[in-house]
Amino acid sequence: MIQFQRLHKSYSVDGRQIVALHPLDLRIGPGEVFGIIGHSGAGKSTLIRLINRLEEPSGGRLLIGDEDVTALDGQGLRALRRRIGMIFQHFNLLSSRTVAGNVAFPLELAGTPRAEIDARVAELLARVGLQEHANKYPAQLSGGQKQRVGIARALATRPQILLCDEATSALDPQTTASVLQLLAQINRELGLTIVLITHEMDVIRRVCDRVAVLDAGKLVETGPVTEVFLHPKHATTRRFVSEAEHVDEAELHRDFAAVGGRIVRLTFLGNGTYEPVLGRIARETGVDYNILSGRVDRIKDTPYGQLIVALTGGDQNAARAGFVAAGVQVEDLRV
């Protein structure tokens, strides 16, 4: 368990106090994949670097288990950092070392015997699919391969927590998907707690269990990804979701003016996503429908669908009640 208790961070610049992170309270459970999303300058990198004390807090407490991280120094802080791995946006590999040498580096610093290092490096390179690239140098690798080296290196000391600082931002979409699949596999197989920061809601949707949304250094929304993604409350969260779904809300509302009837947003979650609910209820209630927008996708392993439809004719109240009875979440956009 990682607990932030009124943790905050400020800087002094030319005599002015700059607040990077306002006091916040947050809990991240053991074994979770927890996402932190925000635009540039929102405070997300500051927050994640407070966990391993790469940033020093200005106040508040940070607990990992029962240990107060904010009170550690010297040997205690070094021991903490061995339990926390970290991967970076631009990989931070040593160009003069081979792939195997980069993965071995933290073990060498820890004084691990050579035979143990060699065995651990071989194990990790197999896990990330790079066993055939052990003797190559970073300049000979693709971006995705470099990030896999970064992941293997971060796992070398058998950490309990893995911090991912914009780990896919420098990668193309296909490579991003493969790296996210690898992180999800590591979470499942090793039970690691993963804290991932990003500015892309699609990354959150694919791999995270819960998410926190930061805006201008403030925690503005948090909860399960299914709830936050499908029913965003804060304006910043709604913008992230619209960007992920490639929806122009202003254009969509202009489309509303061109159609008549009652407009509703229908949200299907789980196996019900694939049930023919809309057609059945239309037949039962005599309602006609016009689909204005639609999407079927997955949030991590859970299928979901969202439709915005205009209902005309028939018994629209009965249709709405029928959707609710079928487990569909209904939001009235225009009655």
Curated annotation (Swiss-Prot):
Residues 2-241 form the ABC transporter domain. It is a peripheral membrane protein. Keywords: Amino-acid transport, ATP-binding, Cell inner membrane, Cell membrane, Membrane, Nucleotide-binding, Translocase, Transport. It holds the Pfam family ABC_tran. This is Methionine import ATP-binding protein MetN. It comes from Xanthomonas euvesicatoria pv. vesicatoria (strain 85-10). ATP binds at residues 38-45. InterPro entries: AAA+_ATPase, ABC_transporter-like_ATP-bd, ABC_transporter-like_CS, ACT-like_dom_sf, MetN_ABC, MetN_ABC_transporter-like, NIL_domain, P-loop_NTPase. Its EC number is 7.4.2.11.
